[in-house]
């Protein structure tokens, strides 16, 4: 079990349902269960090191559904507001829901097509490519489910 600190106020299923309806999406049970326990926050074990072809990446924090005391509830710091803002600016494709970020502002996303977890490297944007080509190039598959992602995070010394 991976514990989280600096979480926002607890939320109920109705808060998540409201976001699902607003975004016209359905979230997987493991994602919902996690957020009912931890609304955002910082994982105790924060490093993803699941692939020998890539450097490990650290999760700086998970985005809350509602309430963000660190940003005075700035809508862009919440799951739905970040998603809408990134879609409006064409930063991410429609099927990726950012739920966490690393220290460089890159996103850990839930792929809404199959509920896998994808790392999206916004800091590697290539101006010579089209937006669609960038959307493909900047994605790195991490694992097949949210639960596997959270449980697969390790402490730095591991």
Protein language model features and the residues they cover:
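A surface-exposed partner-binding patch
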Residues: 1-104, 154-158
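Compact, glycine/acidic-enriched structural inserts
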Residues: 124-148
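Catalytic Cys-His active-site segments of thiol-dependent hydrolases/isopeptidases
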Residues: 118-124
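Short, surface-exposed beta-strand/loop micro-motifs that present aromatic residues
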Residues: 106-111
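Active-site donor-binding loop signature of nucleotide-sugar glycosyltransferases
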Residues: 101, 112, 122
